[in-house]
C-alpha cells in the first residue's frame, strides 16, 4: 500500500499511516483542498501509535501539569496553547501525541489536532511522563526526533524511577539537543520561564523558587480564606451587636440622668414656692 496518494496536486491521507503533506505539497494546495486534508487527519490515536495504558499515576501527572501551567499563564495574561495527548502532524512526519505540549503566542482555543503547516508554527515544548511501556521511546527516540523537528525544549519525567531530564536546542538552526543541567535540582525552561523540580512523587513548577500552586493547594487556600472571612464577619457582627448594646445602655443612662435632673428641678421649684 502506498502511504499517500497525490494526483493533480490533491493530497489524500492514508488511514493506515496518517501524515500531513510535505510542505511543498501543502503550499500548492488550494484553501479548499487544505481544509479537506486537515479534516481527514485523524484526531484519535491510530493503531501504529498505540501505547499500553499507564494507569492513574500517568494520568494524574499530565493533568496536574497542564492545569498548573494553564492556571499560571491565564493569571498573568500570557497567550499560549497547552495540550495533552493532542495528535500533532508535522509535514511528512508520522503523527505523535506528547503527554503535554506548549506553543507560545498562539490562540488557546480547543483543537482536535495540531497541524503545523496550518498553524504556521510547531511545538515550543514537549513533556512526556513515563510510567510503563517502552522507555527507549521517551528517552532516546523522542530526543532525536523532537530535536530534528525543531521543538525547542523536551522534558521527560520518569515517574517510575522518580527522575527528571531535560533537553534544549542550542544555537540558531541547530537540530541536536543538549542536556539541560540542573541547578540545585531545578531545571530551567526558557520556553516557560519557569523551573521544574521533583517534589516527592510529583513534578512541580516554580517561579523564582516559589512553587506554582496546584488545584488541591488552591482549594485549601481558598477554603482557609473563606473560613477566615467568615470568622472575621462573625467577629464584626458580634462587635456591632456589642456596640449597639453599649449605645443603648448609654442612651438609657442619659435618659435616666435627664429624668432625675427634671425631678430635681421640679423639687427645687416646689421648695422655692413654699419658701415664699
Predicted feature descriptions by range:
Residues 2-53, 71, 88-98, 103-125, ...:
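C-terminal interaction segment
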Residues 55-84, 89-96:
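Acidic-basic catalytic patches of nuclease active cores, encompassing PD-(D/E)XK
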Residues 82-83, 155-158:
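A structural signal for short, well-ordered beta-strand segments and their strand-loop junctions
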Residues 152:
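Short acidic/polar active-site loop segments enriched in Thr and Asp
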Amino acid at each position: 500500500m502506498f502511504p499517500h496518494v497525490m494526483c493533480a496536486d490533491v493530497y489524500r491521507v492514508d488511514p493506515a499511516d496518517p501524515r500531513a503533506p510535505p510542505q511543498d505539497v501543502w503550499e500548492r494546495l488550494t484553501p479548499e483542498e487544505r481544509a479537506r486534508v486537515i479534516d481527514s487527519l485523524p484526531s484519535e490515536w491510530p493503531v501504529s501509535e498505540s501505547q499500553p495504558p499507564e494507569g492513574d499515576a500517568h494520568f494524574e501527572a499530565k493533568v496536574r501539569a497542564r492545569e498548573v501551567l494553564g492556571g499560571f499563564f491565564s493569571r498573568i495574561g500570557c497567550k499560549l496553547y497547552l495540550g495533552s495527548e493532542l495528535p500533532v502532524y508535522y509535514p511528512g512526519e508520522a503523527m505523535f501525541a506528547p503527554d503535554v505540549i506548549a506553543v507560545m503566542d498562539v490562540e488557546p482555543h480547543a483543537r482536535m489536532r495540531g497541524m503545523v503547516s496550518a498553524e504556521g508554527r510547531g511545538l515550543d515544548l514537549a513533556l512526556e511522563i513515563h510510567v510503563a511501556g517502552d522507555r527507549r521511546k521517551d528517552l532516546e527516540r523522542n530526543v532525536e526526533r523532537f530535536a530534528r523537528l525543531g521543538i525547542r525544549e523536551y522534558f521527560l519525567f520518569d515517574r517510575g524511577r522518580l527522575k527528571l531530564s531535560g533537553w534544549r536546542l542550542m544555537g540558531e538552526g541547530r537540530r541536536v539537543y543538549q542536556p539541560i543541567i540542573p541547578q540545585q535540582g531545578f531545571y530551567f525552561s526558557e520556553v516557560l520561564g519557569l523551573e521544574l523540580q521533583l517534589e516527592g512523587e510529583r513534578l512541580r513548577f516554580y517561579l523564582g523558587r516559589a512553587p506554582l500552586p496546584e488545584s488541591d493547594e488552591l482549594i485549601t487556600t481558598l477554603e482557609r480564606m473563606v473560613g477566615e472571612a467568615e470568622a472575621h464577619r462573625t467577629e464584626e457582627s458580634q462587635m456591632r451587636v456589642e456596640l449597639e448594646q453599649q449605645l443603648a445602655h448609654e442612651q438609657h443612662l442619659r435618659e435616666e440622668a435627664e429624668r432625675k435632673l427634671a425631678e430635681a428641678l421640679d423639687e427645687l421649684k416646689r421648695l422655692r414656692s413654699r419658701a415664699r
